[in-house]
Structure formats: structure tokens, C-alpha cells
């Protein structure tokens, strides 16, 4: 598609789809139609056979089931469910704006926008070319490019990582006349693995940071101990060792190829600047700024948005406003932003109805008084569920549940939070449908004429994932486990 002109996306449909569900959602919260909200509360009161908590749970269950059955309509479903939570009085109208975690929304939007310009600069392709040129054979190319994809994914969205690295693998495979299937699968599962390594690595990491008030450096060192970043690196090395032996027979020689030309270095410098600023903000006490509401609470989001806007403004001088806007909007995942906005309100509804407290009590009852048993249950249950359902709604739901469990048990929730994140992030690697990055990678292979069976995918993904989860499971408990 050409940039600019008549072929540019219609902004209304880009942001809200067709029909414009986002507009319908926000207009539904406009104070004028108060009779509608009174009507909704009257309906709830009329359902005398169903206590409020059960009604909220029913809305949540239908929402979750619909999101699983209709994955392309997850955002629409979440927004409609959010409207129902308000309509039935579970979330007061005046609290809707405050229930949305704007730090998470701004962090995702800012990072996505900047990363899109970074990808468009061709810098990732250039870096991948350099790695490939140094490798002796296909086996080492696969290992190296999976490690490279993992490194990129620690700071860039998983799907974006696959979109920027997988085409390089496919080109190399065609040039050397071998199947790129193993290489692209390795890129996809390595990208998912590293998503939990840093605050900006994945939506679930951003959500955890927003919920638990973690800063960028807390993922590197927390409570004076090695953080998730280092734990994930050890898990990555262990899984890569398996990958090396799995690929051992792929010893075809690799020839040098021409390096991709970088067309713009500015987005790369701005991405580095954003990461450096996030590191600095982790150590500094951020003051409140008048024109930035809740500055201290939303520091991460403001930093990401400021760097994205500055990069956008500079790029408009080089490419023109319309072309730059097209680049950013073409890959800005408005779907996820609307999905999260709706989920924040839905979760507030079930929290206010008392559902989360009851679920936390149920987990506490099953896990007893043993923190280790509870941690084990959370990790492996998260691995299982995330293999079949999207981890974003799962983590969004479980974060307040984990907080409730820790409160009931009277323990520090850190080990449970980290266990939830690692299990939910890594569990998506088990199946081809468990993570968006997997679906993206398989789609790219299919488009290139390569079919991938579930058996072939899982012959790589299951051992790779279980090794990573087991290493992470043991190390998280070793550093943060509660003993005695």
C-alpha cells in the first residue's frame, strides 16, 4: 500500500473499527442518558434470583468465553462488557476514567509508535544481516538469530520483533535453498520468552509494573536480588542449548549477503534515549508536574509518549506529516489498547462485586498455608491456561487475584507476581495459538508457501518452553521464595 494519498487508512476505522465500537463505548458513558443507567440498575434489582456478585461473574464469564470463541472481536467484547458493568451499577459512571490504568495505556502506545518508526528505518534488518554474516552454518544462524530476536523482544513488542526478524530468516532460507520453518519458529518462541525480561518487553510486563508499582530497573534488580531480566536470560540460555542440539544436523554452509542499508538512524537513537530515560527514572524521585496529571504514578507512560511524539515530529520534517502518520498508525495496535481499556473496567466491576475476593479465598483454600504450593499452583496453572488463551486478559484478571491471595496469606506478593508473569508469558509458547507472535510467524510462513503442522511446531516449542519454565520456576523461588 502506498503511503499518503487516497490509500491512507481512514482514521475513524483505524481507531474504532467499523462499526465504530470505541465511539459507541465512550458515548455510552456521556452523562446525558442517565435514565439508561437507572434502567440498568433497576434491571439488576429486578434479578432477585441472582445476587449481584453472580450477575457480575456471569457477565465476566460470557465476556471471557466470547473472547476465546471470537478472537477477532476481543476488543469489541471487552468494551461492551465494560458498558454493561457501568449500566448495572458495578462501576460508578464517575469512576470509569480513573479505573483505566493510563500508565499502561501510554506505555504501550508510546512504545508501539516509536518501535514502528525504528522498524521502518531498517536498522533491525541491518543488525540481523550482520549476525548472519558471522555464522558458519544454518544451525548457528538459527541459534544466533533466535538470540537476536530475543534481545530485540526484551525492548520491543513480540509481534513487532517477529515481523522485523522473520523476513530476514525467510530470505536467507530461500537463498540457501532450505526450509525456514525451524528458524521462524525459533524466532517466535524466543521473542515470547524474552517478553517478561523488561518492563517494556510485553503488554503483560507493563500491566504487572503498573499494578505492582515496579519501575524499569526493578526488572533487573529487585530487593537487592537479580530481577526477572537475569532469570529470563538463564532460562533463555538453557532453552537455546536444546535448540542447538535440535538443529545439530542442519549444517549447511551460509554465504555472506549484502547488508541492508539503514535509511534513518534517528529512531534508533530515540529508542536508546527512551530506555536510558526509563533507567534514570527508576532511580530518581519524580516530582509532580502541573500539566502532567499523576506524574509520579504515570512516569513510565509519559516518558514513552514524549519520546514517541518527539520522534514523530522530527520524522514529519523528513517524510512529511501524512506519510509519517501512516507509518505510525499502520502498526499501532489500537485493538489491544481498546481491549485493555475495556478489561480494566470489567475487572473493576467484578472487584467491586466481591468476585475477586472470593476467587482469592478459593485459591488460598486450595493452596493451604504453603507459599511454595501456592507459587507452584500459580506458575503451572498459568502455563496451562496461556497455552490456549490470550495471556493479556488472563494476567489482567489474575493480578488482583494474586494480590488478594498474598493478603489472605499475609505474605509478600513478589514471588507470586513473578510466578504469574513467567508462567503466563512462557506458557503461550506451548501451542501455535498460544501467543500472537506464534500466529504471526506461522502466518508469514504460510504466506511464503510453507505449511506448519501442530506436531511440527510443538516438537520444538514444548521442550523449549518446559525447559525455560522449569529454570525460571526454580530461580524465582530461589531468589524470592518465602521460607520458614
Residue ranges and their predicted role:
Residues 147-150, 168, 185-195, 223-229, ...:
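Transmembrane helix-bundle signature of multi-pass membrane transporters/permeases
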Residues 24, 28, 42-118, 224-361, ...:
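Hydrophobic transmembrane alpha-helices of multi-pass small-molecule transporters
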Residues 169-175, 210-213, 402-408, 440-452:
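Helix-loop-helix connectors at the membrane interface of multi-pass transporters/channels
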Residues 94-181, 339-409, 413:
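Membrane-embedded alpha-helical segments and adjacent helix-loop junctions characteristic
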Residues 153-163, 180-218, 236-240, 383-399, ...:
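Alpha-helical transmembrane segments and, especially, the helix-loop junctions at the ends
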Amino acid at each position: 500500500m502506498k503511503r499518503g494519498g487516497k490509500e491512507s487508512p481512514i482514521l475513524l476505522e483505524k481507531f474504532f473499527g467499523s462499526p465504530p465500537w470505541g465511539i459507541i463505548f465512550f458515548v455510552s458513558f456521556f452523562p446525558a442518558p442517565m435514565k439508561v443507567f437507572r434502567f440498568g440498575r433497576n434491571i439488576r434489582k429486578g434479578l432477585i434470583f441472582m445476587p449481584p456478585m453472580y450477575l457480575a461473574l456471569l457477565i465476566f464469564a460470557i465476556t471471557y468465553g466470547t473472547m476465546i470463541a471470537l478472537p477477532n472481536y476481543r476488543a469489541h467484547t471487552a468494551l461492551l462488557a465494560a458498558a454493561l458493568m457501568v449500566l448495572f451499577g458495578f462501576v460508578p459512571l464517575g469512576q470509569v476514567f480513573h479505573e483505566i490504568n493510563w500508565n499502561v495505556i501510554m506505555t504501550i502506545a508510546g512504545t508501539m509508535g516509536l518501535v514502528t518508526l525504528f522498524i521502518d528505518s531498517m536498522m533491525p534488518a541491518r543488525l540481523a544481516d550482520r549476525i548472519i554474516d558471522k555464522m558458519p552454518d544454518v544451525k548457528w544462524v538459527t541459534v544466533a538469530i533466535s538470540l537476536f530476536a530475543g534481545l530485540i523482544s526484551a525492548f520491543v513488542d513480540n509481534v513487532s520483533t517477529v515481523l522485523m526478524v522473520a523476513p530476514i530468516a525467510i530470505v536467507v532460507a530461500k537463498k540457501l535453498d532450505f526450509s525456514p520453518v525451524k528458524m521462524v519458529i525459533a524466532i517466535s518462541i524466543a521473542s515470547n520468552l524474552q517478553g517478561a525480561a523488561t518492563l517494556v518487553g510485553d503488554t503483560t510486563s507493563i500491566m504487572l509494573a503498573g499494578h505492582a508499582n515496579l519501575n524499569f530497573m526493578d526488572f533487573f534488580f529487585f530487593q537487592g536480588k537479580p530481577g526477572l531480566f537475569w532469570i529470563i536470560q538463564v532460562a533463555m540460555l538453557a532453552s537455546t542449548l536444546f535448540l542447538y542440539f535440535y538443529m545439530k544436523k542442519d549444517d549447511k554452509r551460509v554465504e555472506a549477503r549484502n547488508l541492508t542499508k539503514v535509511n534513518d538512524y534517528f529512531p534508533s537513537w530515540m529508542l536508546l534515549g527512551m530506555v536510558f530515560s526509563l533507567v534514570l527514572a527508576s532511580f530518581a524521585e519524580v516530582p509532580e508536574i502541573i500539566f502532567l496529571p499523576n506524574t509520579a504514578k504515570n512516569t513510565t507512560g509519559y516518558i514513552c509518549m514524549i519520546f514517541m511524539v518527539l520522534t514523530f515530529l522530527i520524522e514529519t520534517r523528513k517524510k512529511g506529516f501524512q506519510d509519517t502518520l501512516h507509518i505510525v498508525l499502520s502498526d499501532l495496535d489500537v485493538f489491544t489498547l481498546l481491549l485493555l481499556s475495556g478489561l480494566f473496567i470489567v475487572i473493576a466491576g467484578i472487584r467491586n462485586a466481591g468476585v475477586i475476593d472470593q476467587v482469592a479465598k478459593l485459591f488460598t483454600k486450595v493452596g493451604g498455608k504453603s507459599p511454595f504450593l501456592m507459587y507452584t499452583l500459580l506458575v503451572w496453572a498459568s502455563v496451562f491456561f496461556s497455552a490456549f488463551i490470550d495471556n493479556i486478559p488472563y494476567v489482567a484478571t489474575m493480578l488482583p487475584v494474586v494480590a488478594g491471595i498474598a493478603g489472605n496469606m499475609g505474605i509478600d506478593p513478589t514471588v507470586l507476581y513473578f510466578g504469574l508473569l513467567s508462567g503466563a508469558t512462557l506458557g503461550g509458547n506451548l501451542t501455535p495459538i498460544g501467543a500472537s507472535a506464534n500466529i504471526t510467524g506461522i502466518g508469514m510462513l504460510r504466506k511464503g508457501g510453507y505449511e506448519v503442522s501442530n506436531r511440527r511446531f510443538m516438537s520444538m516449542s514444548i521442550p523449549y518452553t518446559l525447559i525455560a519454565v522449569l529454570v525460571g520456576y526454580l530461580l524465582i523461588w530461589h531468589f524470592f521464595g518465602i521460607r520458614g
